[in-house]
């Protein structure tokens, strides 16, 4: 132990470097346990590996013995986007307007109608497609990842729902739009030729919904109570599909009132049912059966019922066909 050695920012310090090594201040080396440690730009050998100081990049979770020099990318890439190009292949889903990104992991995506903009921090994937004109530069197309843990509609698609009722060029009435997470993806699906009428009662998420709609011209935000559709009847024409995620005890009545006013004959009704919001005293299956019967009484013929497990607990999605002339046997 060299207590008599000169000390300072440029010199060597042996005392605390101990166990056979020496420690430099901002540019020296520390021999602790067989390795060397640089200050702001050096290497640290501690337990057999090397570590860049403030001048190096930090790698992933690579263990104590291995090098830690890789770029830091969080869990699955930077938040703003996902790696695309040649490593990701976009395939059309069986539901028109929905796509699957095949890569390291398969992702549900929609084509971004407002490129460069994300709504809730979702990943974006840019793909270059060859131009149809000979000699022209390839076209860059952006897709947004549709998270089934953030969207009941995406959870239904992942669960294998047969009929969606939402496709390019369609007009959709969305009840319970909240801040516009799912609405933005529905807007991507229907495309510039379609239209989404998004109804939300709460003003706080309604402000975010309006902000999202400013960048998507095919979204019309309506901040009003879906229990009184006559208040906004002058804003909405006839629609091809109604999607409802209102989570209210009287949601069947809310859906029926809006369907009677705005939904075309043979139009599609898609409902997300949360059992606890309707009746928490009975099991979920009983609640679902009661709601389906209420829909039958309102001339909505159920076509399929699908649980949203594992994405949502005690939730199901029901798809029905609206018959204006009366429910056919």
UniProtKB/Swiss-Prot annotation:
This is rRNA 2'-O-methyltransferase fibrillarin. It comes from the Eukaryota. Keywords: Methylation, Methyltransferase, Nucleus, Ribonucleoprotein, RNA-binding, rRNA processing, S-adenosyl-L-methionine, Transferase. It catalyses: L-glutaminyl-[histone H2A] + S-adenosyl-L-methionine = N(5)-methyl-L-glutaminyl-[histone H2A] + S-adenosyl-L-homocysteine + H(+). Component of box C/D small nucleolar ribonucleoprotein (snoRNP) particles that contain SNU13, NOP1, SIK1/NOP56 and NOP58, plus a guide RNA. GO terms for cellular component: box C/D methylation guide snoRNP complex; nucleolus; small-subunit processome. One of its GO terms (biological process) is snoRNA guided rRNA 2'-O-methylation. S-adenosyl-L-methionine-dependent methyltransferase that has the ability to methylate both RNAs and proteins. Involved in pre-rRNA processing. Utilizes the methyl donor S-adenosyl-L-methionine to catalyze the site-specific 2'-hydroxyl methylation of ribose moieties in pre-ribosomal RNA. Site specificity is provided by a guide RNA that base pairs with the substrate. Methylation occurs at a characteristic distance from the sequence involved in base pairing with the guide RNA. InterPro entries: Fibrillarin, Fibrillarin_CS, SAM-dependent_MTases_sf.
């Amino acid at each position: 132990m060299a207590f008599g050695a000169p000390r300072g920012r440029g010199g060597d310090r042996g005392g605390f470097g101990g166990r056979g090594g020496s420690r430099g201040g901002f540019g020296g080396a520390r021999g602790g346990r067989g390795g060397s440690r640089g200050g702001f730009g050096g290497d640290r050998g501690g337990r057999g590996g090397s570590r860049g100081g403030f001048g190096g990049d930090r790698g992933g979770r690579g263990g104590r013995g291995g090098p830690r020099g890789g770029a830091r990318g969080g869990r699955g890439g930077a938040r703003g986007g996902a790696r695309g190009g040649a490593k990701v292949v976009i395939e059309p889903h069986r539901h028109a307007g929905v796509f699957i990104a095949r890569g390291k992991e398969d992702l549900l995506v929609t084509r971004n109608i407002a490129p460069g903009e994300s709504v809730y921090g979702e990943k974006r994937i840019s793909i270059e497609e060859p131009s149809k004109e000979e000699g022209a530069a390839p076209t860059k197309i952006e897709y947004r990842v549709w998270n089934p843990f953030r969207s009941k509609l995406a959870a239904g698609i992942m669960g294998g729902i047969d009929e969606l009722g939402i496709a390019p060029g369609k007009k959709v009435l969305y009840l319970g739009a909240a801040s516009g997470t799912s609405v933005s993806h529905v807007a991507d699906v229907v495309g510039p030729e379609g239209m989404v009428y998004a109804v939300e009662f709460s003003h706080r998420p309604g402000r975010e919904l309006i902000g999202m709609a400013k960048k998507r011209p095919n979204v019309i935000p309506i901040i009003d109570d879906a229990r009184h559709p006559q208040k906004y009847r002058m804003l909405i024409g006839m629609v091809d599909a109604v999607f409802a995620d209102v989570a209210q005890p009287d949601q069947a009545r809310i859906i029926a009132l809006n369907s009677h006013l705005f939904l075309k004959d043979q139009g599609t009704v898609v409902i997300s049912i949360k059992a606890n919001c309707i009746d928490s005293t009975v099991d979920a299956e009983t609640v679902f059966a009661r709601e389906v019967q209420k829909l039958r009484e309102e001339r909505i013929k159920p076509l399929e019922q699908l649980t949203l497990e594992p994405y949502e607990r005690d939730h199901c999605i029901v798809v029905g066909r609206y018959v204006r002339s009366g429910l056919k046997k």
